Amino acid sequence: DANPREFLLLAFSDALRTNTMMASYQFSANKSNHIFKTNSFDPPMRPSEGNVWGTEYGMGTFEAAWSMVIDGVQYANAPTERYVTSSGTEETPPFSQRIGDDVSVHQGDMRDIDAKDEYDAVITDPPYYDNIMYSDLSDFFYVWQRLVLSEEYEWFEDPATPRSESIVANPAENKGVDEFEEELGEGFDVIHNSLKSDGVLSFTYHHSDSESWGELLQALCDADFEVTATYPISSDIQKFTEGEVVEFDIIIVARPANDRRPISWNSLRRNIVRTAKQTHQRLTENRELSEGDIGVIEMGRAFHEYSKHHGEVQRDGEIMSAKEVVDEIYGIIQQGSDIGEVDVFLDLLELDNPSYNDLNMLIRGTSANSETMKDNFLYRMDAGEFTLGTWDDEKRQAFIHERVDGDGDGE
């Protein structure tokens, strides 16, 4: 029977992660590490050797892997769901359908899919720019599995996994930013064509720098998708609050876009700031989320605002690319920018009944300083009431006259 043999191969393949000369020792936990703790081949100076078949103690033994396979098979035949109640964790009765029933499995390049208006949803995990070279890492398992499967399945005939088809930014394969953006766009085009008009695309993405997010957003929007929702999986609150590069995992939900409207960058920036403010207020009031998670959601909402105007955002008479906008969004959400006090003041003038909270939100991620604005009478606080220093404000007029007459620190 092929099934038991392949189940044994699965267990053996998993046990390879911790039973190889590439496995290191985790001193803090007194056990072996698996080889892909860094998503790379990282040969240790002092490999860790365990009992491959299993003892009372140890990590990643064949016995443990085999037990995991059995648990998986049993779950697939009688899947359930667990949920938390006030009395503890509860488990549902088994579902009416087994995992794997009424399923069609295909192997190949997804860009070869020729479906048209067929799918209600596409749930995927796209390549991560230059973050993880899956084709390189998967060879570790492939070469072992091929010994057993090469005569059974045509996909195991080649000596190694495919390289040229991989959508990555990898200099070793003569693939850079342009190739990644083009090929990722090809994939999104295929998904767009295969979805029904009311279909939905959902995928996870992980990276840290604005360039990779810019490439993703550019390819996604070029394929006529609009970001409609984002959900954080993990984030680093310290990096968000300190303005450092942030690594986070995020679930992105997108749908076919409607007609996109032209907009100036200043107007879009105000929309992004306003949306971020509303998002932050809503999440802090109703949910117990970390600031890092809230920051990720704010970032996603900013992506949504941009995707409604992709290819139509103008600054100084030029159309901004998605990568340029993402750089600015990073500045608004977490870093500094060249937006100064006058820019913030002009943004406040656009708001109905601006408040001190609006000032704080608009200043966030800019080089503007609220104290400098206060010293220049661009705003003032009178008995807790926020007042803008407009042309008809007497104190603002007095400040300007003083500067013009040279009695102050005039220019």
Feature locations, PLM:
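Nucleic-acid modification enzymes, centered on SAM-dependent nucleic-acid methyltransferases
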Residues: 1-118, 133-173, 187, 211-212, ...
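Hydrophobic beta-strand segment of the Class I
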Residues: 122-123
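Conserved SAM-binding loop
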Residues: 127
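Short acidic-aromatic active-site loops that bind/stabilize oxyanions
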Residues: 173-181
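A short glycine-rich, Lys/Arg-flanked "PGG" loop and its adjoining helix->strand segment in the class I
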Residues: 181-197, 218-223
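Short glycine-centered segments of the SAM/dcSAM-binding site in methyltransferase folds
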Residues: 200
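Short, positively charged loop/turn segments that connect secondary-structure elements
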Residues: 349-378
